[in-house]
């Protein structure tokens, strides 16, 4: 179990996020981190995943890829970029009500849903046009089992643009999962990028992300 009491006495950082083991850990961590997450993490670490995932979405999306589901929406980093690009029908889903409160204040989402995506997602079958995610499929957060529910709620032909931490891509079964669902998805395109740009912390600079881009088969 994550020791969140000690976190109250020190600044929360990336190592704390990587220490997560259960959904309950995530709820506790982001409850304490929500109000300062953007400044403490996204800005200070020059976090690139929201920008990269939004770039790949814009590159591969069609007009029919709507509504967009932002998985692990957090404080709304991806939603903000997509909204600024003209997207208006964006649904944000996250396990942390405190993070969603921050996203709500920014006003970039048409709908916000508090849910654990490792369980049944409270959205209808074939109701989502595209799924994007930055920073959710990583150490101690969400594993590949979530793709079954995400495919259920996505329309046939719907676009997926998902960031996966490279260190867990094989170890945690993401590669195997894509092979197992190859009858349900198009051949994925994989693009690697740095999670953090030109950061003075060597550990941050070594974090690699795999953008996984595919569509649900018709």
Residue map of PLM features:
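Class I S-adenosyl-L-methionine
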Residues: 186-218
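Conserved alpha-helix/loop element of class I SAM-dependent methyltransferases that forms part
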Residues: 47-64
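A short glycine-rich, Lys/Arg-flanked "PGG" loop and its adjoining helix->strand segment in the class I
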Residues: 145-156
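Conserved beta-strand signature within the Rossmann-like core of class I S-adenosyl-L-methionine
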Residues: 157-165
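Conserved Class I S-adenosyl-L-methionine
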Residues: 172-194
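Class I SAM-dependent methyltransferase SAM/SAH-binding core
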Residues: 69-120
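A short acidic, Gly/Pro-enriched loop at the edge of an enzyme's catalytic core
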Residues: 121-131
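N-terminal auxiliary segments of SAM/dcSAM-dependent transferases
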Residues: 2-24
């Amino acid at each position: 179990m994550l020791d969140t009491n000690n976190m109250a006495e020190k600044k929360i950082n990336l190592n704390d996020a990587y220490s997560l083991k259960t959904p309950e850990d995530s709820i506790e961590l982001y409850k304490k981190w929500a109000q300062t997450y953007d400044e403490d993490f996204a800005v200070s670490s020059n976090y690139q995943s929201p920008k990269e995932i939004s770039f790949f979405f814009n590159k591969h999306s069609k007009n029919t890829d709507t509504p967009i589901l932002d998985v692990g929406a957090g404080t709304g980093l991806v939603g903000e970029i997509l909204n600024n690009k003209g997207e208006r029908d964006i649904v944000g889903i996250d396990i942390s009500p405190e993070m969603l409160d921050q996203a709500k204040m920014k006003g970039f989402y048409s709908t916000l849903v508090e849910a654990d995506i490792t369980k049944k997602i409270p959205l209808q079958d074939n109701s989502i046009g595209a799924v994007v995610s930055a920073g959710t499929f990583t150490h101690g957060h969400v594993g590949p089992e979530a793709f079954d529910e995400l495919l259920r709620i996505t329309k046939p032909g719907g676009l997926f643009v998902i960031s996966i931490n490279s260190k867990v891509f094989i170890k945690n079964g993401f590669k195997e999962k894509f092979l197992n669902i190859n009858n349900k998805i198009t051949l994925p395109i994989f693009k690697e990028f740095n999670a953090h740009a030109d950061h003075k912390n060597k550990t941050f600079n070594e974090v690699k992300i795999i953008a996984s881009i595919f569509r649900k088969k018709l």
